């Protein structure tokens, strides 16, 4: 019985230290998620779903967020996704989703672990399946 208790204590200490160290590491090195929103005229029909979609993405732990559209940067890296700033954005103009690959315009694209592209364009093809995730609004 004594041997079991010793092994049990070692096991509990090992697991606890692993969890604590993982937590501390993830706090210092959070995932960077960039959310790119299509604000073309064609998004008018789905614009009501955009804020809820963005809020659903923002429920992840150990993450910092960046929010931008094809026309402007809404906010750079922040621990909270400031989706309320989308209230001032209105869909207008032509669709140009290739801008979401332009790292000279948005340096956050290079820094991001993942880039979520929110659009309703069924014909848009993702170039890098590992980094870019397409969210199609119906």
Predicted regions and their residues:
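Hydrophobic membrane-insertion alpha-helices, especially the h-region
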Residues: 3-23
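A generic local structural motif
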Residues: 20-22, 52-54, 100-104
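Short amphipathic alpha-helical segments
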Residues: 48-49, 128-130
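Von Willebrand factor
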Residues: 68-118, 122-125, 136-138
